[in-house]
Protein backbone atom coordinates (compact mmCIF):
# COMPACT_ATOMS: atom_id res chain seq x y z
CA UNK A 1 0.00 0.00 0.00
CA UNK A 2 2.75 2.48 0.90
CA UNK A 3 4.42 1.89 -2.47
CA UNK A 4 1.31 3.05 -4.36
CA UNK A 5 0.96 6.16 -2.23
CA UNK A 6 4.58 7.18 -2.65
CA UNK A 7 4.25 7.13 -6.43
CA UNK A 8 0.94 8.39 -7.78
CA UNK A 9 -1.26 9.69 -4.99
CA UNK A 10 -1.37 13.27 -6.20
CA UNK A 11 -5.09 13.38 -6.88
CA UNK A 12 -7.88 12.63 -4.40
CA UNK A 13 -9.80 10.64 -7.02
CA UNK A 14 -6.89 8.23 -7.44
CA UNK A 15 -6.61 7.88 -3.67
CA UNK A 16 -10.33 7.14 -3.38
CA UNK A 17 -10.36 4.60 -6.20
CA UNK A 18 -7.28 2.85 -4.84
CA UNK A 19 -8.80 2.59 -1.36
CA UNK A 20 -12.09 1.29 -2.72
CA UNK A 21 -10.75 -1.17 -5.26
CA UNK A 22 -7.43 -2.30 -3.78
CA UNK A 23 -6.51 -1.34 -0.23
CA UNK A 24 -9.76 -2.59 1.34
CA UNK A 25 -8.87 -6.15 0.31
CA UNK A 26 -5.45 -6.21 1.97
CA UNK A 27 -5.28 -8.61 4.93
CA UNK A 28 -3.73 -5.80 6.96
CA UNK A 29 -6.13 -3.07 5.75
CA UNK A 30 -7.26 -2.09 9.24
CA UNK A 31 -3.69 -1.71 10.51
CA UNK A 32 -2.80 0.45 7.50
CA UNK A 33 -5.90 2.61 7.99
CA UNK A 34 -4.83 3.43 11.55
CA UNK A 35 -1.21 3.99 10.54
CA UNK A 36 -2.17 6.33 7.71
CA UNK A 37 -4.79 8.26 9.72
CA UNK A 38 -2.06 9.13 12.24
CA UNK A 39 0.42 10.22 9.54
CA UNK A 40 1.14 13.94 9.13
CA UNK A 41 1.10 13.80 5.32
CA UNK A 42 -2.15 14.89 3.70
CA UNK A 43 -2.59 12.03 1.23
CA UNK A 44 -1.68 9.40 3.80
CA UNK A 45 -4.37 10.78 6.11
CA UNK A 46 -6.81 10.95 3.21
CA UNK A 47 -6.19 7.29 2.35
CA UNK A 48 -6.36 6.27 6.01
CA UNK A 49 -9.79 7.80 6.56
CA UNK A 50 -11.12 6.66 3.18
CA UNK A 51 -9.97 3.14 3.90
CA UNK A 52 -11.53 3.25 7.38
CA UNK A 53 -14.80 4.50 5.88
CA UNK A 54 -14.80 1.61 3.43
CA UNK A 55 -14.06 -0.96 6.13
CA UNK A 56 -16.86 0.45 8.29
CA UNK A 57 -19.23 0.33 5.30
CA UNK A 58 -18.41 -3.35 4.95
CA UNK A 59 -19.54 -3.87 8.55
CA UNK A 60 -16.16 -4.10 10.26
CA UNK A 61 -16.50 -3.45 13.99
CA UNK A 62 -13.90 -1.62 16.05
CA UNK A 63 -12.65 -2.85 19.39
CA UNK A 64 -13.01 -0.46 22.32
CA UNK A 65 -9.36 0.55 22.02
CA UNK A 66 -9.40 0.99 18.24
CA UNK A 67 -12.69 2.90 18.47
CA UNK A 68 -11.15 5.36 20.93
CA UNK A 69 -8.11 5.80 18.67
CA UNK A 70 -10.28 6.27 15.57
CA UNK A 71 -12.55 8.84 17.24
CA UNK A 72 -9.57 10.73 18.63
CA UNK A 73 -7.83 10.87 15.22
CA UNK A 74 -11.04 11.79 13.40
CA UNK A 75 -11.96 14.59 15.80
CA UNK A 76 -8.44 16.05 15.62
CA UNK A 77 -8.48 15.87 11.82
CA UNK A 78 -11.90 17.55 11.61
CA UNK A 79 -10.30 20.57 13.27
CA UNK A 80 -7.15 20.53 11.13
CA UNK A 81 -6.27 22.73 8.18
CA UNK A 82 -6.20 19.97 5.54
CA UNK A 83 -9.45 20.09 3.57
CA UNK A 84 -9.13 16.62 2.00
CA UNK A 85 -8.33 14.74 5.23
CA UNK A 86 -11.04 16.73 7.03
CA UNK A 87 -13.69 15.63 4.52
CA UNK A 88 -12.45 12.03 4.58
CA UNK A 89 -12.54 12.03 8.40
CA UNK A 90 -16.13 13.30 8.24
CA UNK A 91 -17.05 10.49 5.86
CA UNK A 92 -15.48 7.87 8.13
CA UNK A 93 -17.28 9.34 11.15
CA UNK A 94 -20.59 9.11 9.27
CA UNK A 95 -19.99 5.45 8.45
CA UNK A 96 -19.08 4.73 12.08
CA UNK A 97 -22.08 6.67 13.41
CA UNK A 98 -24.66 4.85 11.28
CA UNK A 99 -23.43 1.40 12.37
CA UNK A 100 -25.52 1.64 15.55
CA UNK A 101 -27.53 4.07 17.67
CA UNK A 102 -24.84 3.86 20.33
CA UNK A 103 -22.15 4.86 17.83
CA UNK A 104 -24.35 7.70 16.60
CA UNK A 105 -24.79 9.03 20.13
CA UNK A 106 -21.03 8.86 20.77
CA UNK A 107 -20.24 10.77 17.60
CA UNK A 108 -22.92 13.40 18.19
CA UNK A 109 -21.66 13.98 21.76
CA UNK A 110 -18.15 14.55 20.43
CA UNK A 111 -19.42 16.83 17.66
CA UNK A 112 -21.55 19.08 19.89
CA UNK A 113 -18.72 21.58 20.62
CA UNK A 114 -17.63 21.60 16.96
CA UNK A 115 -21.15 22.48 15.81
CA UNK A 116 -20.68 25.81 17.61
CA UNK A 117 -17.26 26.47 16.07
CA UNK A 118 -16.43 29.93 14.74
CA UNK A 119 -14.96 28.21 11.68
CA UNK A 120 -17.87 27.79 9.28
CA UNK A 121 -16.39 24.76 7.50
CA UNK A 122 -15.95 22.86 10.79
CA UNK A 123 -19.43 23.73 12.07
CA UNK A 124 -20.84 22.75 8.67
CA UNK A 125 -19.13 19.34 8.68
CA UNK A 126 -20.30 18.70 12.25
CA UNK A 127 -23.87 19.54 11.23
CA UNK A 128 -23.64 17.34 8.14
CA UNK A 129 -22.47 14.34 10.18
CA UNK A 130 -25.21 14.91 12.76
CA UNK A 131 -27.92 15.10 10.07
CA UNK A 132 -26.80 11.89 8.42
CA UNK A 133 -26.66 10.12 11.78
CA UNK A 134 -30.18 11.27 12.66
CA UNK A 135 -31.48 10.25 9.24
CA UNK A 136 -30.33 6.65 9.67
CA UNK A 137 -31.51 6.29 13.28
Briefly describe each language-model feature range.
Residues 14-15, 24-76:
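Histidine/lysine/aspartate-rich catalytic loop segments that bind and position anionic ligands
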Residues 60-67, 83-88, 99-108:
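Short conserved catalytic/interaction loops centered on acidic-Pro-aromatic/His motifs
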Residues 14-25, 46-60, 87-99, 124-132:
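Structural detector for internal amphipathic alpha-helices that build alpha-solenoid repeat scaffolds
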Residues 7, 65-73, 106-117:
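Alpha-helical scaffold repeats of the Armadillo/HEAT/TPR superfamily
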Residues 1-4:
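Short, small-residue-biased leader/transition segments that mark boundaries at the very start
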Residues 7-10, 38-42, 76-84, 113-121:
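Short coil turns that connect the paired helices of HEAT/ARM alpha-solenoid repeats
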Residues 6, 20, 33-34, 75, ...:
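Amphipathic alpha-helical segments within well-ordered protein domains
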Residues 100-137:
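Eukaryotic acidic, Ser/Thr-rich intrinsically disordered low-complexity regions
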Amino acid sequence: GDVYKRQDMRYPEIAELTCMSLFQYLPYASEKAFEWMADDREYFQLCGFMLMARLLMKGNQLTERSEAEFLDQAMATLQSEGVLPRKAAATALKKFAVQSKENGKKVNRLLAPLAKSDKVEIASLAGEIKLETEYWH
